[in-house]
Swiss-Prot record:
Name this polypeptide is given: Sirohydrochlorin cobaltochelatase
Catalyzed chemical reaction(s): Co-sirohydrochlorin + 2 H(+) = sirohydrochlorin + Co(2+)
Subunit description: Homotetramer; dimer of dimers.
Entry binding sites for Co(2+): H10, H74
Record organism: Archaeoglobus fulgidus (strain ATCC 49558 / DSM 4304 / JCM 9628 / NBRC 100126 / VC-16)
Active-site residues, Swiss-Prot/TrEMBL: H10
Name of the gene this protein is made from: cbiX
Length: 132
């Protein structure tokens, strides 16, 4: 069974936003945890949209991870609407164009996000910036 991952970010006109998303995509791809890893954007004018990314994938099951800090409209309404899933919070499983799709929870409450916040501060001393 081929497994895929779509990382969904908000989207921005700034190139750096896409570059950061690509960095995470590449790291996950190199881990070998999934057969395919793609990025997509929830903002309507950014491509690819999540449905487009899913259509391009040759996988039996695709996990969609919202790279968002909490449940906002993109996670509770826009993403489910786009894939024909019920609105609201929580993990959602269903089928989209013949593929099993699982919309995961946004990452904001994960303990690793807490550690990333702390690391952002601790990194200052290691990089030789900030504290003197």
């Amino acid at each position: 069974m081929r497994r895929g991952l779509v990382i969904v970010g908000h989207g921005s006109q700034l190139n750096h936003y896409r570059e950061v998303m690509e960095l995470h995509r590449k790291r996950i791809e190199e881990s070998g945890a999934f057969d395919e890893v793609k990025i997509a954007f929830a903002a309507r004018k950014r491509r690819p949209m999540p449905d487009e990314a899913i259509r391009e994938m040759n996988c039996d099951i695709i996990y969609v991870v919202p790279l968002f800090i909490s449940y906002g409209l993109h996670v509770t309404e826009d993403l489910p609407d786009l894939l024909g899933f019920p609105r609201g919070r929580g993990i959602k499983e269903g089928e989209f164009e013949g593929k099993k799709v699982v919309i995961c929870e946004p990452i904001g409450e994960d303990y690793f996000v807490t550690y990333a916040i702390l690391n952002s501060v601790f990194r200052i001393g290691r990089d030789g910036k900030g504290e003197e």
